[in-house]
């Protein structure tokens, strides 16, 4: 298969290099199109106000001065001279569990691939303090998942969000299909003073686990399993349509009121 590989940790990150090499050893044709620096937390942002510069590192690697979504969007809308068969994003050097997917550039790169018509997988290694020990485990999981998708494709609107415990392959207990868990609200932002005495802020840490019981991605990884969560682009909360329709009915009088 022709595999487009991207990430949000940057083109030089060890995770993406190990992933690309594992896919090549498995017989796939791999093209890496990734940010030229760390763009973690970029979510689905596109660069629209300035042109996007690219730099070919070699025949199979392109660095992009943009977001993960920019990378996949450019690759699938004309930058490459061929059409990839699948998008694989990662390997992220930290978890993308629960609410993390809202902010994750790793997941968003996969989401852009799915939005533009390709099967897509986001792969993250659940590390402690970004100290990764077993990227090879996540890479092998990715290779196995890509092979399975080739043999038995999933429905067209499905993105696979994969989180791998930082264990040796022999110590992984299996694959587990999960739903997204939830975290408590984020920790407070962190104010500091710059050298001129002005206040600056750092975004605070992610909140602790809240909904993390059996069946969630948090629980699967914590118990030594590879979590596979099917997600999709459509954010509509269908269960709330009738409730909100009744609620909107209460706004009708506002249309008849004088301005």
Curated annotation (Swiss-Prot):
Molecular function, one GO term: 5'-nucleotidase activity
EC number of the protein: 3.1.3.5
Annotated keywords: Cytoplasm, Hydrolase, Metal-binding, Nucleotide-binding
Domain of life assignment: Bacteria
Cofactor binding remark: Binds 1 divalent metal cation per subunit.
Annotated family: Belongs to the SurE nucleotidase family.
Residues that, per the record, bind a divalent metal cation: 8-9, 40, 92
Function of the protein: Nucleotidase that shows phosphatase activity on nucleoside 5'-monophosphates.
Enzymatic reactions: a ribonucleoside 5'-phosphate + H2O = a ribonucleoside + phosphate
Requisite cofactors: a divalent metal cation
Class of enzymatic activity (EC top level): hydrolase
Localization: Cytoplasm
Name of the protein: 5'-nucleotidase SurE
Gene: surE
Main location group: cytoplasm
HAMAP family reported in the protein's UniProt record: SurE (MF_00060)
A single cellular component GO annotation: cytoplasm
């Amino acid at each position: 298969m022709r595999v487009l590989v991207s990430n949000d940790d940057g083109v030089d990150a060890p995770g993406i290099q190990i992933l690309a090499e594992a896919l090549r050893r498995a017989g796939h044709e791999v093209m890496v199109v990734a940010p030229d620096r760390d763009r973690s937390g970029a979510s689905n942002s596109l660069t629209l106000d300035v042109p996007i510069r690219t730099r070919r590192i070699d025949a199979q690697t392109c660095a992009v001065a943009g977001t993960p979504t920019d990378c996949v969007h450019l690759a699938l809308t004309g930058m490459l001279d061929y059409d990839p068969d699948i998008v694989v994003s990662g390997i992220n050097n930290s978890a993308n569990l629960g609410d993390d997917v809202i902010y994750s550039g790793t997941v968003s790169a996969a989401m852009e691939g799915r939005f533009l018509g390709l099967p897509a997988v986001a792969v993250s290694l659940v590390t402690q303090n970004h100290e990764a020990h077993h990227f090879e485990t996540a890479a092998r999981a990715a290779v196995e998942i890509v092979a399975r998708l080739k043999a038995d494709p999933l429905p067209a609107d499905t993105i696979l969000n994969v989180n791998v415990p930082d264990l040796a392959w022999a110590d992984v207990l299996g694959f587990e299909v999960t739903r997204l868990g939830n975290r408590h609200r984020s920790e407070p932002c962190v104010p500091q003073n710059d050298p001129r005495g002005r206040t600056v802020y750092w975004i605070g840490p992610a909140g602790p686990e809240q909904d993390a019981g059996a069946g969630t991605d948090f629980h699967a990884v914590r118990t030594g399993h590879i979590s596979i969560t099917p997600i999709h682009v459509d954010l509509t909360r269908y269960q709330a349509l009738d409730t909100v329709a009744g609620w909107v009915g209460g706004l009708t009088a506002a249309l008849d009121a004088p301005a």
